[in-house]
UniProtKB/Swiss-Prot annotation:
It comes from the Bacteria. SUPFAM superfamilies: Ribosomal protein S6. InterPro entries: Ribosomal_bS6, Ribosomal_bS6_sf, Ribosomal_S6_plastid/chlpt, Transl_elong_EF1B/ribsomal_bS6. Keywords: Ribonucleoprotein, Ribosomal protein, RNA-binding, rRNA-binding. One of its GO terms (biological process) is translation. Pfam families: Ribosomal_S6 (PF01250). The keyword Ribosomal protein applies. Binds together with bS18 to 16S ribosomal RNA. GO terms for molecular function: small ribosomal subunit rRNA binding; structural constituent of ribosome. This is Small ribosomal subunit protein bS6. Belongs to the bacterial ribosomal protein bS6 family.
Amino acid sequence: MEKTKLYECTVIIDGGLQDEAIAAAMEMVQKVITEKGGSISSVLEVGRRKTAYPINKKTIGYYAHIEFTAAAPVIGAIEKVLRYEEDLLRYLIIHLTSALLEMRKRVEKYSVVIGSPEDTAAAESDDSGKDAK
């Protein structure tokens, strides 16, 4: 049995599709990964976003990231299936090295989520200082 590695697959699905079609495309991508021997560890659906440039004359895409473990030969089989899926505007599969995982941990440690209690408290303290003047 081959050694498995951690990968991340980022997909951009046609944002002009109905929600049901997008859900079906996401399900198809996950099904392909598991059928080819991968094991999905997490799925992050970012949602509809404007693309940086038109892709096949489309400017809105539905973005999603899927983390999974698989053996190296499985990646080619997954890409072969995704390549011919018409609802996918783009896809990219990368190997998550230890350096990338360490960088991700540092970013998460020092990032502040907008709308978090810390942001709200900081904004309220700034507003109260302005009213006193």
